[in-house]
Amino acid sequence: MWTWVLLTLFYGLTKGGREIVKKKALEISTVIEVLFFYTLIGFLMLVWDAGNAVSVIPGRLPLIALKSFVIFVAWICGFKALKSIPLGIYGILDVSRMLFATLLGVIIIGERPGAFQIAGNAIVALGLFMLGLQKKDGGGEAKPHYIVLAFISAFLNAVSGTMDKILTKDVTSSQLQFWYMLFLLIFYGLYILLGRTKMDVKKTVKNYWIWILSLMFILADRALFMANAIPDSKVTVMTVIKQSSVIVTVIAGRLVFKEKGLAYKLLCAAVVLAGIVVSVL
């Protein structure tokens, strides 16, 4: 059990770090510039494995393409929200994907969470509700439409996570990562071409935060796909463990972006952490 738990924990903590890097990257470049180039750089890191990727079961490619489209929309929503919402609040709002993923895991995959998993979900939901009681944040007020975008992103990421569990039954983690990134790159390319989006290529390439983001993304996703491929792993539990990212985002919101209200956010994060611990018992 502990292998997939540790892999998922690595993903969660790295994801928290990625939110910091994303926000720093968005201070220099636009949302679509960051998305396209960080996806491109990430894909180039995987090109060496193309020989293995082409042996994927052809019938799985449409489902991988669908997963990529889901993430394509999720990332646009998530990046737009992150650019305008204080990091500490965004990180805890993103925890809502756990509730969505648990529901999808039960309905689609047929998982049956035990008493500890149900209790853990309830505790994490409490932490999210507590955050909602805090109306304002020193780093700026979160406008309703950006909160909606954050929730849409969380739901679509939960859909993607459920698809991962289905796909990794007969697609290796390296194959899934290669094709998923390739399709994602195609979607962003079409978005730029059809929308005639202007890109400051020179400035974006020099944005070193994007390079760091790409490396973190590739490492974290590979760990997550490996965890999903382990037969004993459960989406309902993995999703709760992923929320360890909220600890990183709350602390970074204060240390890096000087956001206020740290004590209350840490309390919310502590409640979330307690829920994670209970869920893996």
What are the roles of these predicted feature ranges?
Residues 40-45, 93-107, 183-187, 220, ...:
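Alpha-helical transmembrane segments of compact multi-pass small-molecule transporters, enriched
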Residues 1-69, 75-85, 133-149, 182-231, ...:
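Membrane-interface interhelical linkers
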Residues 53, 78, 99-119, 129, ...:
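C-terminal transmembrane-helix exit sites in multi-pass transporters
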Residues 31, 87, 113, 173-174, ...:
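Membrane-helix interface/capping residues of multi-pass secondary transporters
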Residues 144-177:
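Selected transmembrane alpha-helices and immediately adjacent juxtamembrane segments
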Residues 12, 16, 47, 68, ...:
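Hydrophobic/small/kink-forming positions within alpha-helical transmembrane segments
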Residues 34-35, 90, 176-177:
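Juxtamembrane helix-start motifs in multi-pass secondary transporters
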